[in-house]
Amino acid sequence: PYDSEWKDRVRTRIRRSDGVIALISKNSLSSTGQKWEINCANEENVPLRGIWAYKNDRTELEGVSAFVWTWDNIKAFIDSV
């Protein structure tokens, strides 16, 4: 459903990034675009951090280590890249 131009633009942005933060929720399980972006970050060896978008939703996605949304968790990831 995503054209090659979109994928090329996203891949270029991911390659230029020091890291990628993915907001994870139950909707992530059916989001083909988000799954593609996560796989792309992994393929490009760009550090990836999952952040759960909601306090009552702890959806797990394969290939993503997810953490609670706190500024300390986000800061720790940014400081690590």
What is each PLM-predicted segment?
Residues I24, W52:
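Short beta-strand/turn micro-motifs composed of small residues
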Residues D18:
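Conserved acidic residues
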